[in-house]
Amino acid sequence: MPKHFTRIRDLGFEGAWKVLERAKEMKDTGYRGRTLEGKVATLIFEKASTRTRISFEVAVRHLGGTTIFMTPAESQLGRSEPLRDTARVISRYTDCMIVRTFGQAKIDELASFGSIPVVNALTDEGHPCQVMSDVLTMYERTPDLSQVRVAWIGDGNNMANSWIEAAMYFPFELFMAFPEGYEPDRQLLGLALEAGAKIFLTRDPHMAIDGAHYVNTDVWASMGQEEEQKRREAAFKGFCIDGALMGRAHPDAKFMHCLPAHRGEEVTDEVMESPASIVWDQAENRLHMQKAILEWVFTE
């Protein structure tokens, strides 16, 4: 049976820490390997991306493999044929599927019916590669994650969901602020709390950010939600990370954003360009974390 990375929970506690440590080691040593030598990874992107495509293509090459990239027009996941058929066919041609799509159910079906590893490069429900990369970005600076307080300010979107998942395996405190009606997945939150995750929810961004060591946000309208832009701008009034709000965090706090950022909406230009901003380190760490994840799915 192939190993999949469809969500952070696929790693389990031991796997999550193993991948985190391995990603740091790969970064520190400039690792190049042969794990994917002779293997072909199919990148299936229904949602366009700059960082995700480049970082995954480079990651595969650093591990000795090659890639085939399928555009949204070419992939047609579930439109021209059943997903289960697509999964079986691609499994006969290539060695791994790296999928960036809308519904999580598509990722899960590809994993269920294919015979090769499936890696979640983003869905509407989760962004596990990004959040694992963000944990790496914190871990580099604060190896004792039990001393870390993370603030999430904004939408209860796929990023928020994956942060909740990460809190199940890593011992940081997670304070999250959302406007009413924009909460994260309730069932996932329940699972995390039952697992002992230290997660606290509020409507007040000031309360969530007070004393935080790492301050996170994301766009207010994700891909596919453009028609909701005006309504969301009104709902998220007061949730913009500006100098005043950032000033409530820990004196040495760092600002994080998965990018692309809508400057002037969820974050000001002042904060993005400040010494507190570590968004470019986050972007780089996608490469190292994805190499570690690919190695994990291909290692018994």
Curated annotation (Swiss-Prot):
<feature type="binding site">
    <location>
        <position position="100"/>
    </location>
    <ligand>
        <name>carbamoyl phosphate</name>
    </ligand>
</feature>
<feature type="binding site">
    <location>
        <position position="218"/>
    </location>
    <ligand>
        <name>L-ornithine</name>
    </ligand>
</feature>
<dbReference type="InterPro" id="IPR002292">
    <property type="entry name" value="Orn/put_carbamltrans"/>
</dbReference>
<keyword id="KW-0963">Cytoplasm</keyword>
<keyword id="KW-0808">Transferase</keyword>
<dbReference type="Pfam" id="PF02729">
    <property type="entry name" value="OTCace_N"/>
</dbReference>
<protein>
    <recommendedName>
        <fullName>Ornithine carbamoyltransferase</fullName>
        <ecNumber>2.1.3.3</ecNumber>
    </recommendedName>
</protein>
<comment type="pathway">
    <text>Amino-acid biosynthesis; L-arginine biosynthesis; L-arginine from L-ornithine and carbamoyl phosphate: step 1/3.</text>
</comment>
<feature type="binding site">
    <location>
        <begin position="127"/>
        <end position="130"/>
    </location>
    <ligand>
        <name>carbamoyl phosphate</name>
    </ligand>
</feature>
<feature type="binding site">
    <location>
        <position position="76"/>
    </location>
    <ligand>
        <name>carbamoyl phosphate</name>
    </ligand>
</feature>
<dbReference type="GO" id="GO:0005737">
    <property type="term" value="C:cytoplasm"/>
</dbReference>
<dbReference type="GO" id="GO:0016597">
    <property type="term" value="F:amino acid binding"/>
</dbReference>
<feature type="binding site">
    <location>
        <position position="158"/>
    </location>
    <ligand>
        <name>L-ornithine</name>
    </ligand>
</feature>
<feature type="binding site">
    <location>
        <position position="286"/>
    </location>
    <ligand>
        <name>carbamoyl phosphate</name>
    </ligand>
</feature>
<dbReference type="GO" id="GO:0042450">
    <property type="term" value="P:arginine biosynthetic process via ornithine"/>
</dbReference>
<dbReference type="GO" id="GO:0019240">
    <property type="term" value="P:citrulline biosynthetic process"/>
</dbReference>
<feature type="binding site">
    <location>
        <begin position="258"/>
        <end position="259"/>
    </location>
    <ligand>
        <name>carbamoyl phosphate</name>
    </ligand>
</feature>
<keyword id="KW-0028">Amino-acid biosynthesis</keyword>
<comment type="similarity">
    <text>Belongs to the aspartate/ornithine carbamoyltransferase superfamily. OTCase family.</text>
</comment>
<dbReference type="InterPro" id="IPR006131">
    <property type="entry name" value="Asp_carbamoyltransf_Asp/Orn-bd"/>
</dbReference>
<dbReference type="InterPro" id="IPR036901">
    <property type="entry name" value="Asp/Orn_carbamoylTrfase_sf"/>
</dbReference>
<dbReference type="Pfam" id="PF00185">
    <property type="entry name" value="OTCace"/>
</dbReference>
<keyword id="KW-0055">Arginine biosynthesis</keyword>
<dbReference type="InterPro" id="IPR006132">
    <property type="entry name" value="Asp/Orn_carbamoyltranf_P-bd"/>
</dbReference>
<dbReference type="GO" id="GO:0004585">
    <property type="term" value="F:ornithine carbamoyltransferase activity"/>
</dbReference>
<feature type="binding site">
    <location>
        <begin position="222"/>
        <end position="223"/>
    </location>
    <ligand>
        <name>L-ornithine</name>
    </ligand>
</feature>
<dbReference type="InterPro" id="IPR006130">
    <property type="entry name" value="Asp/Orn_carbamoylTrfase"/>
</dbReference>
<comment type="function">
    <text>Reversibly catalyzes the transfer of the carbamoyl group from carbamoyl phosphate (CP) to the N(epsilon) atom of ornithine (ORN) to produce L-citrulline.</text>
</comment>
<dbReference type="InterPro" id="IPR024904">
    <property type="entry name" value="OTCase_ArgI"/>
</dbReference>
<feature type="binding site">
    <location>
        <begin position="49"/>
        <end position="52"/>
    </location>
    <ligand>
        <name>carbamoyl phosphate</name>
    </ligand>
</feature>
<dbReference type="GO" id="GO:0006526">
    <property type="term" value="P:L-arginine biosynthetic process"/>
</dbReference>
